[in-house]
Amino acid sequence: MSKKALLMILDGWGLGDHGKDDVIFNTATPYWDYLMETYPHSQLQASGENVGLPDGQMGNSEVGHLNIGAGRVVYQDLVKINLSCRDNSILKNPEIVSAFSYAKENGKNVHFMGLTSDGGVHSSLDHLFKLCDIAKEYNIENTFVHCFMDGRDTDPKSGKGFIEQLEAHCAKSAGKVASIIGRYYAMDRDKRWERVKEAYDLLVNGIGKKATDMVQAMQESYDEGVTDEFIKPIVNAGVDGTIKEGDVVIFFNYRNDRAKELTVVLTQQDMPEAGMHTIPGLQYYCMTPYDASFKGVHILFDKENVANTLGEYLAANGKKQLHIAETEKYAHVTFFFNGGRETPYDNEDRILVPSPKVATYDLKPEMSAYEVKDKLVAAINENKYDFIVVNYANGDMVGHTGIYEAIEKAVVAVDACVKDTIEAAKAQGYEAIIIADHGNADHALNEDGTPNTAHSLNPVPCVYVTENKEAKVADGRLADVAPTILHILDMVQPAEMTGCNLIK
């Protein structure tokens, strides 16, 4: 078994449908064809939940390299929360247990506040509905929902329908709509404290237009020409849903940028000049970490701890490694590959080759691939690295231009560079794994023949360049790449890596 491994990431080099849109298939790639005929290969899934994104969402380079280096699926916040609601593990979330137990034992009110829409950018109605269900399970009488209306990520008059949906859910679950206000006020992010004050006064002091029918109140606002984003404060006259000392507040937005300012005035900082004071004893829960500087707030879904990435694990075991790419993908083979860490590990060398200074890469489709290849071959021939990762950027960066002839030239350049790199690696006793992080050049045309500049949902290749004639490679996903590299290096996979070795 070889003890040296080369991981080659061909950015944007997916496995297409072999139609006209599949530039890789339709371009002469003699060396790639040789690899596919000679060595064991398989397919990796590189999009959707296989890389921790919402189902059906295209993969991207950041997420791809994060999963490749982590050796596990790294879930995005939204997906993590969705899964937790779906499999009911949210009920065992220690912060959820603490919030609702505290309210139950101390007879406190529970408040849910956040963007009440299906826009999917800042929040999810499903998460809100689940919170209402949990309140019902804990039998909490006073559960109040404070609705921030959208109209930016949704139709400007869709909010009335969302309030109807919420009220219908609350009727069979728990909770009452206590207040409504536009996101323009409640979710400012530009330090316009006079706007935030409108939301603060509504939530804390119950200042707003009194209404007995919240859906009707929304319609009246529309009739006056005021749509969702700008809805003025509305108070449910039938309940006292103001936030009081020692209450439980759950801010259910999972995106942080527009949740910070309201959190600041409720929990972090008195602003007497603006008439806003933090509320004593508030049990305040954020869906995700809103700001590392916030004190005394709870976090329902904390950031993933990506410990023991491939880079970290190799360094801890005294291995020498090289990470190399041109500028466009340098952050991907360093920062993202190492789980979001800027600083190199011990014995980790990095080579950055400048990308060409052109307006768009169709003007130079080979980019800096040949320069990367030359530096890489020289490094391979030094024979001092146990592990090397390289990214060839062309398939993705030229793929994004949508210019077919340029993508063809990019594919030709990559094929030539793969040849020189792999032949050098074989001569020095390296085994290689060749993959992509996601597709792009494999799907360059839409069905109507217009250029497609986006990534594709296609699987990506996994080629195992080895002397072992018996070897086979199983299908998998990007999270399986790091365990496979460790297998080549004859190293035991750390517990944190939940991916699988694909070499059989």
From Swiss-Prot:
Binding site for substrate: 122, 152-153, 183, 189, 255-258, 329
Organism: Bacteroides fragilis (strain YCH46)
Positions annotated as active site in the UniProt record: 61
Protein name: 2,3-bisphosphoglycerate-independent phosphoglycerate mutase
Keyword Manganese: yes
Assigned protein family: Belongs to the BPG-independent phosphoglycerate mutase family.
Keyword terms: Glycolysis, Isomerase, Manganese, Metal-binding
The organism's place on the tree of life at top rank: Bacteria
One GO BP: glycolytic process
Pathway this chain belongs to: Carbohydrate degradation; glycolysis; pyruvate from D-glyceraldehyde 3-phosphate: step 3/5
Cofactors (names): Mn(2+)
Entry annotated with the keyword Manganese: yes
Cofactor descriptive note: Binds 2 manganese ions per subunit.
Enzymatic class: isomerase
GO cellular component: cytosol
GO terms, molecular function: manganese ion binding; phosphoglycerate mutase activity
Assembly and binders: Monomer.
PANTHER family per record: 2,3-BISPHOSPHOGLYCERATE-INDEPENDENT PHOSPHOGLYCERATE MUTASE
Function text: Catalyzes the interconversion of 2-phosphoglycerate and 3-phosphoglycerate.
Binding site for Mn(2+) 2: 11, 61, 437-438
Binding site for Mn(2+) 1: 396, 400, 455
Reaction catalyzed: (2R)-2-phosphoglycerate = (2R)-3-phosphoglycerate
E.C. number(s) listed in UniProt: 5.4.2.12
